[in-house]
Amino acid sequence: MGRGKIEIKRIENANSRQVTFSKRRAGLLKKAHELSVLCDAEVAVIVFSKSGKLFEFSSTSMKKTLLRYGNYQISSDVPGINCKTENQEECTEVDLLKDEISMLQEKHLHMQGKPLNLLSLKELQHLEKQLNFSLISVRERKELLLTKQLEESRLKEQRAELENETLRRQVQELRSFLPSINQHYAPSYIRCFAIDPKNSLLSNTCLGDINCSLQNTNSDTTLQLGLPGEAHDTRKNEGDRESPSSDSVTTSTTRATAQRISLV
């Protein structure tokens, strides 16, 4: 047998009245808390008992809520803002938009899986179906992006392989060309030849300034640049040029000696 309906009137018994007040007060504060959490509403409850004791609840801050309430009361007293004025149609449209926004926000929260206590089984099944459709769409989009990235990576890999093959061919061509140069030409660029001892006769016969100048101009080693085939010809021509120069120097030395003897 169900519980009978309680008649709403003042309880005459003081003890029963106090017990009922405590129970109903706790239930009221609990409902206010649930309302603030489920609906994301700013709720404030103020209760004074028969003896004057204060009981209050606020989802944010009691002072903040009271200040907001006072500002709302002031703005509603200004002409043209109250919905019960000439702009009743506009206010009705605004209320409809607010309700629609509130409903969309509630659906958004349901999609996140937050306030599900008040949903029925049918609503939960419908929500599950929507989430499955959304999940399928997300997976398809993800697979498409991954396939695109994979294709781009393959193209980059093919380009890199072609560039590496081209560079490898160029290196092989250079390697096949450089050894021939090193074998035939590189060793013969610089060669040294010793001077024939016959060309150094002036080292013992020069006198005074002539001896010093000739010693500064002669050396034991000369540097010759040229190809291998030109080495013998160069040495031969050098010997031919040095022979007459040696004779001319000897003649000039003899003349200088004769002049000094005549002066004495």
From Swiss-Prot:
Q: What residue spans carry the Basic and acidic residues bias annotation?
A: 230-244
What subcellular compartments does it reside in? Nucleus
Annotated GO biological processes are: positive regulation of transcription by RNA polymerase II
**Transmembrane parts of this sequence:** none
Specify the MADS-box domain's residue ranges. Answer: 3-57
Highest taxon of source: Eukaryota
Keywords assigned by UniProt, alphabetized: DNA-binding, Nucleus, Transcription, Transcription regulation
Q: InterPro entries, from UniProt? A: MADS-box/MEF2_TF, MEF2-like_N, TF_Kbox, TF_MADSbox, TF_MADSbox_sf
Q: Which GO terms describe its cellular component?
A: nucleus
Instruction: Return the annotated region ranges for Disordered.
Output: 223-264
Q: Where is the K-box domain?
A: 87-177
Q: Which GO terms describe its molecular function?
A: DNA-binding transcription factor activity; protein dimerization activity; RNA polymerase II transcription regulatory region sequence-specific DNA binding
Here the segments flagged for biased composition (Low complexity) are 245-257
Function, in words: Probable transcription factor.
Could you identify this protein by its name? Answer: Agamous-like MADS-box protein AGL15
Question: What taxonomic lineage is listed for the species of origin?
Answer: Eukaryota, Viridiplantae, Streptophyta, Embryophyta, Tracheophyta
